[in-house]
């Protein structure tokens, strides 16, 4: 029985899953919108939202926690210098998932996951 087991396995072992979501979280923070499968987008939301909440309070300890979870100084800098102040007045719900059809090869449901208040330069780059 799978009672009280949260999270999706996504046909990966735990280290592969952790590395995949670490990379996807970095891409989402860097580009502010990415396209992926719907189940991955729903799980990625559980990784990215706590990072942004952490970035709302700038301290050395929080920066070290964010680095431990992302392993990328560029991502940590963007989280604390841009995203933390941008979402300071928002109490959660920093991401939006938009369904965008099905993948041609295997008919997997696809989705865009984006930060809700994207900056203008990333909106122009996405179009």
Curated annotation (Swiss-Prot):
Look up the record and give one Gene Ontology term from the biological process aspect: translation
The answer to whether UniProt assigns keyword Ribosomal protein to this entry is yes
State the organism of origin: Salmonella typhimurium (strain LT2 / SGSC1412 / ATCC 700720)
One Pfam family it belongs to: Ribosomal_L17
Keyword Ribosomal protein present in the record's keywords: the answer is yes
Which protein, by its recorded name, is this? Answer: Large ribosomal subunit protein bL17
Q: What family does the entry list?
A: Belongs to the bacterial ribosomal protein bL17 family.
Which SUPFAM superfamilies does the entry mention? Prokaryotic ribosomal protein L17
How it assembles, according to the record, is: Part of the 50S ribosomal subunit. Contacts protein L32.
Q: Which top-level group of life is the source organism from?
A: Bacteria
Segments forming a coiled coil: none
> What are the alphabetically sorted keywords of the record?
Ribonucleoprotein, Ribosomal protein
GO MF annotations, alphabetized: structural constituent of ribosome
- InterPro entries given in the database record: Ribosomal_bL17, Ribosomal_bL17_CS, Ribosomal_bL17_sf
Q: Name one GO cellular component term.
A: cytosolic large ribosomal subunit
